[in-house]
Amino acid sequence: MFKIQESIFGICPLAFVVFAGVGTSAFTQADSPRPNIVVILVDDLGYSDLGCYGGEIETPYLDGLANEGVRFSQFYNTARCCPSRASLLTGLYQHQAGIGFMTYADWGEGYEGTLNEKCVTLGEALKNAGYTTCVSGKWHVAAHRNPPEHSLPENRGFDKSTVVRTHIDSYWKVLKGCDVYQDGTIVIPGNNNNKSLKNPYHPEKDFYTTEYFTDVALDYVDNALQGSDQPFFLYLAYNVPHFPLEAPDVTIGKYETKFDDPAWIAEYGRGWDEMREKKLARQKALGLVAADQKLPEVSYFNNRKIMPGLQTGFEHNALPKWNDLPENVKQEVLFRRAIYNAQIDNLDENIGRLTDKLKSEGVYDDTLILFMSDNGCSGEMGRFGTHFEGGKYDHTEARFENGKYIPGGVKESGQWPHNDKVGGVGYKKSNYDQWKKASGWATSQGQCWAAYSNTPFRKFKKFVHEGGIATPLIAHWPNGITAQGKIVSKQYFHFMDVMPTLLEVAGAEYPAAYDGRVRTPLEGVSMLPHMQDPNNDSLERLLFWQHETHSAARKGNWKIVTDNDRAESIKWELYNLANDRSETDDVADKHPQVVKELSGEWHDFARRVHVTPFPEKRAKR
């Protein structure tokens, strides 16, 4: 269990000032070189999966970084993979960088589906400031097919790059369409039939993405430190713990054993209901949430189609209670959670390999490490992670007619779990050897466990309620952050704040023009003053979100949010996050003026950054 450190809980008072296009001030320590910078991004990690955020998974290396650095309790992403990466890399809202939705189509400005030329990337800005720049892992900000040259890492400021340009749907294999590129050249071609791929760095070992991307990163660090006085910037973007469920057998077995251990169960509980309660208690003890924080009721979701290539999630019925499940189903879902935990455990081991390398090279204390997730935990494959729920669906698809949402009817049938890919009997613990490397959209832990991963928040990845957009953020820099073990909880921040933070750390300025092109001014603000002083509550700001049909705005403690921003008259929910980050008490009817003001701000934002007109109102280019 993560050691409880001194922490400070609080949320800033209601504020009404907008920060936009903020510049950076140079920051350098006296008689100290500029630090190396490592940004670690993971994929679909829940807010509270890590030990240092109250989770039960063993993450000693990440917990150590938190103990020696600071954690943020109110750090936000954009709710989805590609948009979050675009915001992180550019210091802008995702629409301003060209990726308002995903990378599968071009609907014009704001929705180009690829990184545009109106932004500056972290690679470009830090290379311009004298850093050696490198990226390893998942890129996913280039068009899915025929990406333009200006959207690729080798053309956006990275001296060295080893990436999968698109999504990654396997750990053990490199699937067709998921080729590995090194400096623009394919080095591992995708092949759906390759079941015995080996790690190029360790030919005696099977290929596994987490370990391979770490090997690449270690190689880059090694080369960057040889014969050069330049600091380095490493962007390490893992695909873990995104589905499918794939992890080393020995680590899976470790968690299977724990789930049957009476002492472990006494500390952490058994099943998602009891485990959520115990996790919330740990979060309160750590100072991550308010002492009176409550758990929300959680519901599962299905998708509704807006147009070809664009669908969105909508809530359905409540998730099942653990004690209502038959014992055989409990065993199946515990096994899925064991694999999920093993993926994160393995991630932590690999981050340990990186930090050990930095220590052995004598640069650990003067390297800024940031760790975060691109969105909340995913519930994309049903309640139990089988993709087909109870077997098969008989349903009438939800739809929009004249701006009005018409819910679909869903009726479940069949047996659980079921998937025709394994002889019609489903992906079960008993036949795991047959599907352990199935890859693709094979398996996940399901929405019941995902809700637990997102404790204490509502909803999941894709939504802009807190469960979809709240991410852990760990900042570690012994020579630059002295408030060790503290929690930055009085302010809220966003992915777009990483760019100005790193520029300040590097003593650099944001270029108003790059390669002769005028660039969009920064939207983010530097987090460095708050890393150095977690009590700093001087910042006042307004933030916005929009993804699929989900939208939100936050000003101080007030947050409005909706799952249907296409409605002729949007029904906004309103929450006071000072005492309700779980978003359980909608006070919109009690404070109509707040809703009116914030919704007006959101509409102004939507027009300014090209959220509107929405894609379905445009012609695909």
Which positions does each model-derived feature cover?
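Formylglycine-dependent sulfatase
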Residues: F2, S7, I11, F16, ...
